[in-house]
Structures are given as C-alpha cells and as structure tokens.
Amino acid sequence: MKPSIVAKLEALQERYEEIQALLAEADVIASQERFRALSKEYAQLTDITSCYRQWRKVQDDMEAAEMMLDDPEMKEMAQEELKEAQSVNEELEQQLQVLLLPKDPDDEFNCFLEIRAGTGGDEAALFAGDLFRMYSRYAEARRWRIEVMNANEGEHGGYKEIIAKVIGDGAYGVLKFESGGHRVQRVPETESQGRIHTSACTVAVLPEVPEAELPEISPSDLRIDTFRSSGAGGQHVNTTDSAIRITHIPTGIVVECQDERSQHKNKAKAMSVLGARIRAAEVQKRQEAEASERRNLLGSGDRSDRIRTYNFPQGRVTDHRINLTLYRLDEVMEGKLDALIQPIVTEYQADQLSALSEQD
C-alpha cells in the first residue's frame, strides 16, 4: 500500500483515539451539541480504523512468517502462514481503499421518491403502481418509513404520478441509483391477443437535505395556485381548496401536494420537494461539468435515461448501465432489490477508485 495512504490512515486512527478520549470528558458530555457531533464523527471512523488495525496486525504476521522462512524446520509452516496472510492483506487493502473514497454527504439523508408514468397509457400507470409497491416493500424490509406526499391515480389503477418521502438512515445513499427510466415488457390484462406491450416510467430520487442547505427561494419567483383535492385520499377535503400547486418561475419546476387536509401542511410539503428539486438540478449541472468525460452511473431521472428493463414473460430484469441480467423478476417486484443495487454500488466505487488512481 502507498506510504501516502498509510499516513492518511494513521492520521484517522489518531483522530479516532482523540475523539474516544474527548467523549469521556465532563465538559463534552455536558454539551449536547458537541457530544452529538463527536459521536457522529466517531461512528463514521469506526469501520475504517477497525479495518486499519486488522491490516497492521497482518503486516506483523507477514513479517514474522518471513523471518521463519530461514528456519528449515519452520519453513513449510511459515510458507502456509505467509500465503494466508498475503491473501487477507489483499482483501483488507481493497476494503481500505473503498472506505477511503470520498463520501457523498447527502447519502445519510432521507429522500424523496418520485415515480411518473411515461409512454404506455394505462399500462404505464399500473407499472408505476407496481414500482411504488416494490420500493415500499424494500423500505419495509429495511425498517424505513414511507410517507406519501402526493398521488395522482391512474384511471384504471396505479399512478400517473406519485411522490413519497422515504424516511430512514442512509435512504438516499441506497436508493439514489434508482433514478432514470424504467421500462416494462408484459402482456396487459386487457390484451386479448396475448401480445407483449412495452411501457415506461421514470423514477427520480432526491435527498431531503436540512433546510439550511437548501437554495434560497425568493417568494417573487413563485406562483402558488390552490385547487380542490381529488382522487383517493382527497375525498375528505374536496369541499375546500386545500391542494397546492407551486411553480418556480425561473426553472419551470412545478410541485403539487394534496395529501393533507390542511392547505398550510400541503404548502410546507410542496416547498420541501421544490427545494430538493432545485438543489438536485444545481448539483447535477455541476457534476456534469466536472465529469463530462466519465460515465455517470447515477441516473438523471430523465425519460431518455433508460436504466432498467423488466421483462415479465421471461421473468427477467436487466440493468443496462452494467449489463447485469437476473432471472429473478418475481423476487425483485416483491422488494428484494439488493441483488440489483449492490452490483451498481460496487461498480460506482470501482469507477471512483479508477478516477483517484488517474489523479495519482
């Protein structure tokens, strides 16, 4: 491993031990804010320092095994031990490289999940409903909570559009790779000839960042319309104009919210989604400028940015970004998404490592 990387790891180990001592001090314990901040930093350093300590022990083991190679009686055993230690060393070095990758500060946040029916009419709306159910099951398995912000139901079921907040530690970091175009190939229930139809939906995943980090939105840049709620969930309020539509004039971004009885609550929810969308657009623009020559596994949430195909007749799901095909569609639709998400995360980390080695 490069001396510069070892020096960095040594500095992190020292900081970890320093925080450990600070957390036992009375004045730190007395300050809730400082104690919370240090506890968070301590938790963030735990994995990498634990891995680094294991790596240091393996260096000692390899050194001891190499010294025994000169002893004829111990040589065979030493060779075995050295081979085993070298294998462990290789694994630990890979883990340390991944743990040293720059973290996206947004990864720890809750997120907004937006699903929109695209081409395919009623079938696309039904598929949007299937996708929402899939993500809901996945969230449930991870002990996350889903809070629907706005739902525009399809005429024959499903959704033309649904926006939900996913509440749970690291929700954005896990789901952010789901942004993009999702295509479905299946025989609709109304299809008498048994022909396969192709429909599409778009998914956008945005971090719910703290208010202080949201872009400043001038009230003069907003057009706010009220209207009567409609559809499921809206019947109990459709005698008053409690639903809200906010248009951000400079960007043309429009957000609707009609899920609450109170106009005030609907407006607050709509503003939080609007802030997240404006910030996401700014971040994406910056990332595109910085990495125009490098592929981006993070989908844009744009219809043309097709990331995945779900083929029901063949029970197949394909992720086009990494050419991954699984014949486990039933499991995926029941929310077992890790088999799709983990390979993308691994590939993303490999891209980051490649970019870092290019810099070196």
Swiss-Prot record:
Compartments reported by the entry: Cytoplasm
Extract one GO cellular component term from the record: cytoplasm
Keyword Protein biosynthesis attributed = yes
Using the record's annotations, give every residue carrying the modification N5-methylglutamine: Q235
Source taxon at top rank: Bacteria
Q: Does the keyword Signal apply?
A: no
Please outline how this chain is modified post-translation: Methylated by PrmC. Methylation increases the termination efficiency of RF1.
Q: Which GO terms describe its molecular function?
A: translation release factor activity, codon specific
Q: Name one Pfam family in it.
A: PCRF
Task: Give the UniProt keywords, A-Z.
Answer: Cytoplasm, Methylation, Protein biosynthesis
Region annotated Disordered sits at: 285-305
Q: Please state which protein family the record places this protein in.
A: Belongs to the prokaryotic/mitochondrial release factor family.
Report the function annotation for this chain.
Peptide chain release factor 1 directs the termination of translation in response to the peptide chain termination codons UAG and UAA.
Record protein name field: Peptide chain release factor 1
What is the gene called? prfA
